[in-house]
Amino acid sequence: MKGYHGKLALLGLLIFMMVFASACSSDKSSSDSKGGTSTDKKEPIKIGVLASKTGALEAYGKQTLRGFELGLDYATDGKREVAGRKIEFIVEDTETKPEVAVQKATKLLEEDNVDFLVGSSSSADTLAVLPLAEEYQKVMVVEPAAADSITGSEFNKYIFHSARNSSQDAVAGAAAIAKKGVKIATLAPDYSFGRDGVAAFKEAAKKLGAEIVKEEYADPAATDFTSNIQKIIDAKPDYLFVVWAGANSPWKQLSDMKVQEKGIKISTGAPDIAALSTMEPLIGMEGFTVYYHDLPKNKINAWLVAEHKKRFNGDVPDLFTPGGMSAAISIVEALKKTNGNADADKLITTMEGMSFETPKGKMTYRKEDHQALQSLYAIKLEKKDGVPYPVPVLIRELTPEETAPPIRNK
């Protein structure tokens, strides 16, 4: 009997140990499926960024990319994570060529399986890519391309335009110079950005009573504007309004051909710092700007300026840096609201009418056409000691309500 009871006790001990081990295993399995460890197993959110890393708009691409990365860091407190999902971004160079932009966007969508597209530096590149956002049902945040047609005739519901558009530029530009009896000529590059820009400016200027007496369109890659400028001189306008993007700007030739000495005042949107360096003859010009680092007075812009200087050898953020930052902030804010859900339909519902804080203050994606309503700045170019280019000095901030463009996607 004693042997029997000993075997029974041993069997009981073995059963207890098996049950205990099973319970421990079950607890471990349960803890692996929830809490902190599950974060590691969540798929990352992938963002495909299209930018001109080469070509005529290379500088714009660089500014946007710097801003986008800074925006991700600002909006996530440096974690690059939302709702337990890591944020990754993949950059592709469009080379400032629409056909290349389509190839690179297709690669991002099919091979990299991105959840968002962002870009591009060129309106022509961007317009070529818009149909892919609809085809693959992915939200695309457009920055810094500005053509009205992005949220107008070529709009689809997957497009959100964080950049300002040509009509917003036009309202600001017309406010600076257009009034009853004023004759205005225009000079712009011969592609969607330039033509949309002039069309919008004409509409705004005519409403204020001005007359458009000459429109000149130059090859976007032109380096000689002699013929265009001479035709403008011959038209004898009071003002020349210039819409331009790219390093091959007409400013030097406008000075060489003494346009202002002939009684024609020049007005434009103040460009990036590199182009401002060529605008010494335009000191005193009144116009507008999308951004200059000294103009917005808010904590996000203060952070941007300080952090940009820290990361980039003392350089200040340039014309399109805050746009890249704003695009990133808007994506992160939307993902916070969806708790990390990157389903396109859920994001669209969330982003329509969504407001978010940026280096330029509050922006709002208008529900009807997904255009970001935002501030622009009426400025005058002035010479400042210690600054090697004409500086945009604030006349007044133009509010999002003042610069709200017509809805053109109907």
Which residue stretches match the model-derived regions?
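Extracytoplasmic ligand/sensor domains, especially the bilobed periplasmic-binding protein
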Residues: 114-216, 262-287
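Extracytoplasmic "Venus flytrap"
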Residues: 48-71, 92-98, 121-122, 189-195, ...
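Short, solvent-exposed amphipathic alpha-helices that sit
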Residues: 60-78, 100, 169-172, 192-211, ...
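Hydrophobic alpha-helical segments within soluble ligand-binding/sensing domains
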Residues: 101, 162-184, 195-196, 223-226, ...
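Solvent-exposed, acidic/polar segments of extracytosolic/periplasmic ligand-binding ectodomains
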Residues: 27, 34-35, 358-410
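Beta-alpha junction/loop-to-helix N-cap segments that form part of ligand/metal-binding clefts
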Residues: 28-36, 59-66, 74, 78-152, ...
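Extracellular/periplasmic periplasmic-binding protein-like sensory domains
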Residues: 254-325, 336-337, 342, 390-410
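Short, low-complexity disordered leader/linker segments with a strong preference
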Residues: 1-46, 408-410
